[in-house]
């Protein structure tokens, strides 16, 4: 019995260590976001004027996947799908826009883009993009954004990956595409509801303009420093 417990303990340690190494030290996904999108100023847009999804322009599959440079962008970028006009699929709710939390995670701000079956969420320094695109992979393949530690000048934040599927008007996010459900988003009247993996439920209201204090993301994470330069 003792040997079994020891073996189980050793196996658990190696599993945790392997997950940690994968999350923090595996190669970062290549930066595939359009450089003009990343360099542009997302604070200059009226987010109450939503693009018309009439199918007369580009489709989701024609646009490169958006993702986060390093552990966070340095300013709020332009919308990834600003030139996309593909209609939403059957069963999808229209939750596009700029939203801010009024209960739960009060002050949380995010931009939700949709075009066809594709969804992009930009918030707190990160860009999560899932669905058809021109550079590969339906799941988001990105970082969580919170910097756990630094080695010298290099920041280390955990990798994340999730799929998005519509379930009776509710947008479900599953870890790696096959894992557990970790996030939901869905409309409730004029509000957007965000149910997160920590068990919280955040109600958000629509904004037309990005508040000035959200243009540059605040540093996140413990930022434990090793071998500072």
Which role fits each region the language model picked out?
Residues 59, 105-159:
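N-terminal glycine/threonine-rich, aromatic-flanked beta-hairpin/loop signature
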Residues 103-105, 123-125, 175-177, 198, ...:
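A mature extracytoplasmic/lumenal domain signature
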Residues 106-110, 127, 160-162, 179-184, ...:
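A structural detector for short beta-strand units
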Residues 156-165, 198, 217-228:
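Short, surface-exposed secondary-structure junctions/capping segments
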Residues 157-189:
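Acidic, glycine-rich flexible loop segments
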Residues 191-199:
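Short, exposed beta-strand-loop hairpins at the edges of beta-sheets
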């Amino acid at each position: 019995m003792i040997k079994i417990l020891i073996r189980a303990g050793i196996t658990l340690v190696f599993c945790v260590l392997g997950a940690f190494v994968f999350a923090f030290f595996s190669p970062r996904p290549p930066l595939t976001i359009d450089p003009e999108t990343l360099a542009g100023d997302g604070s200059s847009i009226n987010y109450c004027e939503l693009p018309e999804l009439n199918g007369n322009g580009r489709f989701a599959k024609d646009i490169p996947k958006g993702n986060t440079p390093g552990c966070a962008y340095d300013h709020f970028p332009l919308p990834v799908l600003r030139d996309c006009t593909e209609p939403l699929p059957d069963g999808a709710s229209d939750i596009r826009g700029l939203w801010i939390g009024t209960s739960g995670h009060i002050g949380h701000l995010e931009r939700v883009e949709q075009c066809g079956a594709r969804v992009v969420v930009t918030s707190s320094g990160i860009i999560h993009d899932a669905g058809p695109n021109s550079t590969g992979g339906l799941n988001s393949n990105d970082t969580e954004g919170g910097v756990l530690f630094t080695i010298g000048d290099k920041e280390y934040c955990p990798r994340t990956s999730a799929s998005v599927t519509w379930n009776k008007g509710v947008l479900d996010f599953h870890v790696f595409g096959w894992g557990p459900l970790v996030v939901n988003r869905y409309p409730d009247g004029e509000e957007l509801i965000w149910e997160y993996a920590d068990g919280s439920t955040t109600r958000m209201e629509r904004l037309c303009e990005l508040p000035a204090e959200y243009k540059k993301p605040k540093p996140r994470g413990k930022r434990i420093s090793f071998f500072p330069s």
